[in-house]
Amino acid sequence: MIWVAVVITMLLFILVAKPTGIYLEKAFQGSKKLDKVFGPFEKLIFKITGVKEYNQTWKQYALSLVLLNGFMIVVVYFIFRLQGVLPLNPAHIEGMEPTLAFNTAISFMTDTNLQHYSGENGLSYLSQLIGITFLMFAAPATTLALVMAFIRGLAGKELGNFFVDFTRALTRVFLPIAFVTALVFVALGVPQTLDGAVTAQTIDGVKQSIVRGPVASFVSIKELGNNGGGFFGTNSTHPFENPGQMSNILQMMLMMLLPTALPFTYGRMVGNKKQGRILFVSLFMVFLLGFITITTSELNGNPALNAMGIEHVQGSTEGKEVRFGTVFSSLYATVTTAAETGAVNTMHDTLTPIGGLVPLVNMMLNTVYGGVGAGFVNIITYAIIAVFISGLMVGRTPEFLGKKIEGKEMKLIAVTILFHPLLILGFSALALSTSLGTDAISNLGFHGLTQIVYEYTSSAVNNGSGFEGLGDATTFWNITTGLVMFLGRYFSLVTMLAVAASLKEKTVVPETVGTFRTDNGLFGGIFIGTIVIVGALTFFPMLVLGPIAEFLTLK
């Protein structure tokens, strides 16, 4: 029965992807029906804010994005610092210390949602609503807007206006879907209230304080926007965030909704629907491989415990919730790191070595399918590299969407590809070279190395999940992960927008018999191979020293 439920869940991922992709294309490219519904409200927003609907250059678009996000970071930083004297604070929670406020503001603005605090004890309701939830809408809207400009550039069209795209992302995508799904979560048992904690008497007569709050509205955008931060410290393992299997499946669907839809949106916008389908299918195969690997490892149990003769019919159940089971916990871990969300319904630090390797590799690849917008930019980065390598092998000038890929584009792409591992491995090396970093390790040896690398990988790709045995609530970790989150977010977005702008100016080369097609199975295979060779092998030495060495030791 459990496998039937898994297959149905997978089919739901596939069935909703294309219709959502079509909707996104209409929402951003102009649809008379949608303009009639949302247009008046959007025009009112533009009038109040003074936004003028004109086409921006790539530099203007990127600058608008960075400045708006920077302004939001500053505003929310002061909300966190001053929450102790602000209203909606029934628990009388004090303001955050400076480095934690710095880390948290950047974390939620970059769609990472790395949390070095416990949700219910670290933030007031005002901070949760005005600070956290506000950024949970703004962060994915930022990258969804950018990916639309990116695709327009690839299609040879004007990039558009960031503020217009940002507004449409909010009004036409995130607000309506989040509102409806929040109501569904309430129906499934997730609380939604501004009342403070309640005191309950347990069956043994002890009084217990039960924290609640506006959880349903928080969870809906948490998953839809690939945010991942928890209202409660234990995230989606908490019964108030994720009461049962229905809410669990809905959360996974929301995480996968926009990332899986974007290949179809891309195909329609560039006039090559088949290429969009090839990208979707290729990535889904990689996703399935990851799910099969982690599930097999978790069902086989912990090798050390198996050697002691301990029963493991349910697999490795350490750190897992009984109401979800091993299989759906494995699926959730695969989804949350493939879609770069970071929400967890099981403790990733307790996964078996190979089980923990899958979420880590998903994040290192950052393409299967990646987070809202930013993930798809990475997908196209690897697609262009695949075309470039193929062109070199046959002695032809590489072409993508009929446009020549030349030195300027490849230099920007090369810098983008190299920057990602440099951030992760460079800061990991820094942490390992000082007691400020190594003192946070709770498990010495191979697993301790994995804890550190996982933290910086999660930060760099804006995932936010963690091996929570790491004691990261310190000044060192707050500052270093904050820097990694900021650089990991904006550097690649700006450089790849420059690539799209460069391709926009190029004329389309007529297709010939010798043109390397990017809408067939051959390209799909080369695309997957490029992801594995360029992406996974970059981190292979670290994976050998971390989870693989731990696995061999346990064996």
Swiss-Prot record:
Pfam families: KdpA (PF03814). InterPro entries: KdpA. It is found in: Cell membrane. The keyword Membrane applies. Keywords: Cell membrane, Ion transport, Membrane, Potassium, Potassium transport, Transmembrane, Transmembrane helix, Transport. GO terms for cellular component: plasma membrane. The chain crosses the membrane at residues 2-22, 60-80, 130-150, 173-193, 246-266, 278-298, 374-394, 412-432, 483-503, 525-545. Its main location: membrane. It is a multi-pass membrane protein. GO terms for molecular function: P-type potassium transmembrane transporter activity; potassium ion binding. The system is composed of three essential subunits: KdpA, KdpB and KdpC. PANTHER family: POTASSIUM-TRANSPORTING ATPASE A CHAIN (PTHR30607), POTASSIUM-TRANSPORTING ATPASE POTASSIUM-BINDING SUBUNIT (PTHR30607:SF2). Belongs to the KdpA family. Part of the high-affinity ATP-driven potassium transport (or Kdp) system, which catalyzes the hydrolysis of ATP coupled with the electrogenic transport of potassium into the cytoplasm. This subunit binds the extracellular potassium ions and delivers the ions to the membrane domain of KdpB through an intramembrane tunnel. HAMAP family: KdpA (MF_00275). This is Potassium-transporting ATPase potassium-binding subunit. It comes from Bacillus thuringiensis subsp. konkukian (strain 97-27). The gene is kdpA.
